Amino acid sequence: MTRKEQLAAVAVEDMVVFSPEGETRDYIAVFTDVTCFYCQKLHREVDQLTDKGIEVRYLAFPRGGVDSEGAQKLATAWCAEDQQNTLTELKAGVELPVNDCADNPIAAQYQLGQDMGVSGTPAIVTSSGLMVPGYRPADDLVALLGLD
């Protein structure tokens, strides 16, 4: 199965999604960990991406594994009423009480990342299935998608 097919098999509802105000011209899927410096740096540029019509779809990839503190923090975001705001707060270093719901997709998304060859975060996958390991500035991602 290609990366594009693997991503298509994941319900968008199971991702934490930041959508453009206007037309969505393309999307990127990002395997993320709230405790990762470069994930935090990329997250601060989400508005630059959405302003260009790029939807950012986050998938959980706790670098320490599914039993780590990072996994608990990711679950806290995924289980929140306001997933976007909670994820943003956690990436900004805000300490929030752990909220771990039974049906969270953290383990499944971590396994998907491993199956796709993710070895670190952030790992960005374009809509065409191209894997871009590591942090890239928003402008570079816009150019990579041909939307500059």
Model-inferred region functions:
Residues 1-30, 34-64, 98-120, 141-148:
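Extracytoplasmic thiol/disulfide redox context detector
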Residues 65-142:
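Thiol/selenol-based redox catalytic cores and closely related redox-interacting motifs
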